UniProtKB/Swiss-Prot annotation:
Source species: Arabidopsis thaliana
Pathway participation: Amino-acid biosynthesis; L-isoleucine biosynthesis; L-isoleucine from 2-oxobutanoate: step 3/4; Amino-acid biosynthesis; L-valine biosynthesis; L-valine from pyruvate: step 3/4
GO cellular component: chloroplast; chloroplast stroma; plastid
Transit peptide, from-to: 1-34
Family statement: Belongs to the IlvD/Edd family.
Gene: DHAD
PANTHER family, per database record: DIHYDROXY-ACID DEHYDRATASE DAD, DIHYDROXY-ACID DEHYDRATASE, MITOCHONDRIAL
Function: Functions in the biosynthesis of branched-chain amino acids. Catalyzes the dehydration of (2R,3R)-2,3-dihydroxy-3-methylpentanoate (2,3-dihydroxy-3-methylvalerate) into 2-oxo-3-methylpentanoate (2-oxo-3-methylvalerate) and of (2R)-2,3-dihydroxy-3-methylbutanoate (2,3-dihydroxyisovalerate) into 2-oxo-3-methylbutanoate (2-oxoisovalerate), the penultimate precursor to L-isoleucine and L-valine, respectively.
PROSITE patterns with a match to the protein in the record: ILVD_EDD_1, ILVD_EDD_2
Protein name: Dihydroxy-acid dehydratase, chloroplastic
Length: 608
């Protein structure tokens, strides 16, 4: 079977049954034929009890004792013939209150159409989501990271209870992507992720805006560099339509990494949300999933140590979010593999930072689409010898086979640097240890901040007190190491992101004049001299909970150390006097999270 994968830079449409004709502003998809036949498996093996396509759903559709199950399925419209078809669970993270997710219901309709055209039965169901941008800077952000595990739990629950044979998930926002892949890893049934796509940038009076522009406008306002009217103008033009936040923030980081890992179709991570090609991808997903069922090719065949390394290479080369560390560790654990902080450091030492993308750079994901998309970037990384091309993907072919006929990056493009002129010779994600982070921490160092910072601690119990202080006197932060603690997985709870504090610092013009440390996380939109994921967290008695105002803290990226000048004797005295703070919640979903969540260095998983 030959199916079509598409590129935005080409002259011909593929066959009409797969991609109906439409106007895509001269970016017409090229025909890249990728056989879904495995190099080792017969593409059409005889159906037996072990390899029949509906081997899961037949548990409820075939036994006469399951009459109740069959009655319900007839009630929702299935015929007797339909009961013999594979049933595909189509899980959408649709909800109206977020630009990242508001269009996913429409995409799920196209996925269902493709599933049915492939001769299968598609059943759509929804899972929950949290808008990080809406909840950022409030206690609502405590619910963000745990939504990843709720997404995984809910997809696993429905897929298992309903006996679906395969899964196509349609995520949009940051935690959606790892949540859907974690569910696929746990289930280990054929699955494909269809990314909802990136938003286009906003424009007003020759200026370009995105969501981070909106966050940084507050710091610019409190520092007096813009008026309140100018601030509101930024807000009105930062999010001009559907799609995930447009820079190499967490959503686009994870979508690119998952494509590099092989769990989404080529171009999935770079086709913008509102481009007609996104609907074409949705319709193609069913055809590819049918082939995965025939081959019995499952997530644990695709997510391997080598493909996880490919994902890490993508994160480093593109300047991706530090959240990828948490999420890739959690994805690895969902398939029974161990990924450690040291694995990230090894990749960071070997892979240069090449992409001039926001938040630290100039361009956005839509610009990657215009120069050939993620496959062109992956082909470049493969040609440099940075990726393993032998890894299997959801096309039924290896990564190298998928990329063999992909057009190279557009000649003259300036987004992806040549190896001879990287933004940074090694990766921007650095794993730091020391007496302040004995179990590790994650720094995001793009090279623009410098590689060394030392200064007195300015300690805050939570981000809200820090925001009040910088609003009152921004210049008091100059030269300090800002410490925001009590924001870890258990202490936050939920390890909230510190985008509002970092944006306030950057907006106030202090990006090179102070550092920020936290046992919480950073948004993919955060930049500056920032170190997060400090372990152990303050709630668990970590050294970050013992720091006092004025203590000298030194961050040395070259030595990969984060230390304080407080003597061991003094730290021991402080530890003896320390008592664990009371949990901030004692009921509900966050309390369950506190009781189950592992440390940041273990991916904040909740099912171990």
């Amino acid at each position: 079977m030959q199916a079509t994968i598409f590129s935005p830079r080409a002259t011909l449409f593929p066959c009409k049954p797969l991609l109906p004709s439409h106007n895509v502003n001269s970016r017409r998809p090229s025909i890249i034929s990728c056989s879904a036949q495995s190099v080792t498996a017969d593409p059409s093996p005889p159906i037996t009890d072990t390899n029949k396509l509906n081997k899961y759903s037949s548990r409820i559709t075939e036994p006469k004792s399951q009459g109740g199950s069959q009655a319900i399925l007839h009630g929702v419209g299935l015929s007797d013939d339909d009961l013999l078809k594979p049933q595909i669970g189509i899980s959408s993270v649709w909800y109206e209150g977020n630009t990242c997710n508001m269009h996913l219901l429409k995409l799920s309709e196209a996925v269902k159409e493709g599933v049915e055209n492939a001769g299968m039965v598609g059943f759509r169901f929804n899972t929950i989501g949290v808008s990080d941008a809406i909840s950022m800077g409030t206690r609502g952000m405590c619910f963000s990271l745990q939504s990843r595990d709720l997404i995984a739990d809910s997809i696993e629950t429905v897929m298992s209870a309903q006996w679906y044979d395969g899964n196509i998930s349609i995520p949009g926002c940051d935690k959606n992507m790892p949540g859907t892949i974690m569910a696929m890893g746990r289930l280990n049934r054929p699955g494909i992720m269809v990314y909802g796509g990136t938003i286009k940038p906003g424009h007003f009076q020759d200026k370009t805006y995105d969501i981070v522009s909106a966050f940084q406008s507050y710091g610019e306002f409190v520092s007096g560099s813009i008026s309140d009217e100018q601030r509101k103008t930024v807000l009105h033009h930062s999010c001009p339509g559907a799609g995930a936040c447009g820079g190499m923030y967490t959503a686009n980081t994870m979508a690119s990494a998952i494509e590099a890992m092989g769990m989404s179709l080529p171009y999935s991570s770079s086709i913008p949300a509102e481009d007609p090609l996104k609907l074409d991808e949705c319709r193609l997903a069913g055809k590819y999933l049918l082939e995965l069922l025939k081959m019995d090719l499952k997530p644990r065949d695709i997510i391997t140590p080598k493909s996880l390394r490919n994902a890490m290479v993508s994160v480093m080369a593109l300047g991706g979010s530090t959240n990828a560390v948490l999420h890739l560790i959690a994805i690895a654990r969902s398939v029974g593999l161990e990924l450690t902080l040291d694995d990230f450091q090894k990749v960071s030492d070997a892979v240069p930072f090449l992409a001039d993308l926001k938040p630290s750079g100039k361009y956005v994901m839509e610009d990657i689409h215009k120069i050939g998309g993620t496959p062109a970037v992956l082909r470049y990384l493969l040609e440099l010898g940075l990726m393993d091309g032998d890894c299997m993907t959801v096309t039924g072919q290896t990564l190298a086979q998928n990329l063999e006929n992909v057009p190279s990056l557009t000649e003259g493009q300036e987004i992806i640097r040549p190896l001879s002129n990287p933004i940074k010779e090694t990766g921007h994600i650095q794993i730091l240890r020391g007496d302040l982070a004995p179990d590790g921490s994650v720094a995001k160092i793009t090279g623009k901040e410098g590689l060394y910072f030392s200064g007195p601690a300015l300690v805050f119990e939570g981000e809200e007190s820090m925001l009040a202080a910088i609003s009152a006197d921004p210049m008091s932060f100059k030269g300090t190491v800002v410490v925001i603690r009590g924001e870890g997985p258990k202490g936050g709870p939920g390890m909230p992101e510190m985008l509002t504090p970092t944006s306030a610092i950057m907006g106030a013009g202090l990006g090179k004049e102070c550092a920020l440390l936290t046992d919480g996380r950073f948004s993919g939109g955060s930049h500056g001299f920032v170190v997060g994921h400090i372990c152990p967290e303050a709630q668990e008695g970590g050294p970050i909970g013992l720091i006092k105002n004025g203590d000298i803290i030194t961050i040395d990226i070259g030595k990969k150390r984060i230390d304080t000048q407080v003597s061991p004797e003094e730290m021991n005295d402080r530890r003896k006097k320390w008592t664990a703070p009371a949990y901030k919640v004692n009921r509900g979903v966050l309390y369950k999270y506190i009781k189950n969540v592992q440390s940041a260095s273990d991916g904040c998983v909740t099912d171990e």
